[in-house]
Structures are given as C-alpha cells and as structure tokens.
Design a protein with these regions (language model features):
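N-terminal Rossmann-like FAD-binding beta1-loop-alpha1 element of flavoenzymes
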Residues: 3-30
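Dinucleotide-binding Rossmann-like beta1-alpha1 core, especially the glycine-rich loop
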Residues: 47-127, 136
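Glycine-rich FAD pyrophosphate-binding loop
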Residues: 22-44
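Conserved small/polar residues in nucleotide/adenosyl-binding loops
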Residues: 152-153
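Proline-glycine-enriched beta-turn/loop adjacent to the NAD(P) cofactor-binding site
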Residues: 11, 34, 47
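The feature captures the short pre-catalytic strand/loop hairpin that immediately precedes
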Residues: 133
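Glycine-rich "substrate-gating" loop/helix at the edge of Rossmann-like oxidoreductase active sites
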Residues: 141-147
Length: 153
C-alpha cells in the first residue's frame, strides 16, 4: 500500500498529527516501534501540559509549548478527554534555587507564557499545604494542566 504521509510515533504528538491529517485527502500511516501506542515518551510523561517556561526562548519548542497549552482545554473538550487546569509549580528550597526560578520566570515571559508568577513561601503553602516548610518559594504557572494521555490518544 502507498501512503502520502508517514507519522513517526504513536504517542500524543503522533496522534494529534494523525487527527489533523484526517481532515485532508491524504493517506497516512502511523509507524510505531513498540507493540502498542503511547509506549515511549507519552508513557513516561507525567501527563502535564507544560506552561512553556522551560523551553529556550526563540525556539520552535518554546512557541509550540505556549500554543499547545492554550489549545489543550478546547481540544480535550472536543475529544471528550478529561483535562484539569491545575497549574504547575517549580519549587525552590534555597535562595540559590530561587535564582533558577527567576531565570525560568524571565524565560517564560519572553516565551509569552500567560499567568506566570513567582510566589513566596506563604502563598506556596496556601496552594500546597503539605509541602515542606523548607520550601522558600516557587514559580507558579497557572496555565499549565494535566490530561489523561492514554485516553487522549
């Protein structure tokens, strides 16, 4: 059989590419090296929909992280897949680690990440009451969330 497009990988990204290709008059084949879908990166992922603050500014990854996070709630609704916009935290346990939090914040702002803030220990404990008292602060990305990736595919 001949195909117009080969999609490499049957994880979340491959599934979304295949879904998009299904809107066009093309024959597509999904090539997966494992014996089932979602056995690679998707399986190892914690199902987080990243806010986009960690990718190097100016890269395609940075752009797609932010765009992907923005479309995920609508896409999950269309696919009837559970999605929770619970945000994400990068927690610091020292002032040295807070320097890294500030770096991630600056990068996130450059990347166009919405609802990104640096929070102090008090606010962190309001969000996560059981977190260690040694935590000094965090980067809080309100736009991040989680999705049930195996249902998603």
């Amino acid at each position: 059989m001949k195909y117009d497009v080969a999609v490499i990988g049957g994880g979340v990204v491959g599934a979304l590419i295949s879904r998009e290709l299904s809107k066009y008059d093309v024959k597509a084949a999904v090539l997966e090296r494992c014996n089932d879908i979602a056995m690679g990166t998707t399986k190892a992922n914690s199902a987080i929909v990243h806010g986009g603050f960690d990718a190097v500014s100016g890269t395609v990854k940075a752009k797609l992280n932010v765009e992907g996070t923005a479309i995920m709630p609508k896409l999950c609704k269309e696919l009837n897949v559970p999605y929770r916009n619970n945000g994400s935290l990068v927690v610091a346990f020292s002032e040295k680690e807070m320097e890294h939090v500030h770096l991630l914040y600056d990068r996130g702002i450059k990347n166009g990440v919405p609802e990104l803030e640096i929070i102090d220990s008090k606010r962190l404990h309001e969000l996560e009451p059981n977190i260690s008292d040694e935590a000094v602060g965090a980067l809080y990305s309100k736009s991040a969330g989680i999705v049930l990736s195996l249902i998603y595919i």
